[in-house]
């Protein structure tokens, strides 16, 4: 991928992280706020793994699924805790493929930690991109 295209993708990821942070600031009083925050979390994770996949490709590493991207990024030291990231991926998969109110509440409660983890990695990766 061309450097400019990766830069645009990384910028989109950064804006998505900011949007997720804004959504978390709204609070969880309304179900619509929870749903919107979960939707932003899904989008942010989608952009995260695509950015990392492109960075891995620059290293000559082929990773075509979010799970493989997480595993390879951990192997390179870009992620600090593989299990944490696999749990983040599991939460994204659960929110993308099912909807149950109790599950939404449970995952919503973990999104602030997921947001912080993605923000931390974004800062680390901005130095490598």
Residue ranges and their predicted role:
Residues 1-129:
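Solvent-exposed interaction patches of small proteins and small membrane subunits
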């Amino acid at each position: 991928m061309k450097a400019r295209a990766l830069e645009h993708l990384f910028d989109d990821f950064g804006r998505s992280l900011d949007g997720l942070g804004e959504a978390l600031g709204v609070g969880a009083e309304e179900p619509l706020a929870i749903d919107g925050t979960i939707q932003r979390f899904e989008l942010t994770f989608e952009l995260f793994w695509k950015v990392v996949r492109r960075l891995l490709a620059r290293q000559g590493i082929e990773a075509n699924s979010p799970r493989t991207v997480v595993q390879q990024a951990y192997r390179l030291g870009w992620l600090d805790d593989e299990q944490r990231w696999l749990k983040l991926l599991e939460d994204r998969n659960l929110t993308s493929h099912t909807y149950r109110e109790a599950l939404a509440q449970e995952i919503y409660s973990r999104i602030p930690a997921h947001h912080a983890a993605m923000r931390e990695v974004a800062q680390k990766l901005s130095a490598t991109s």
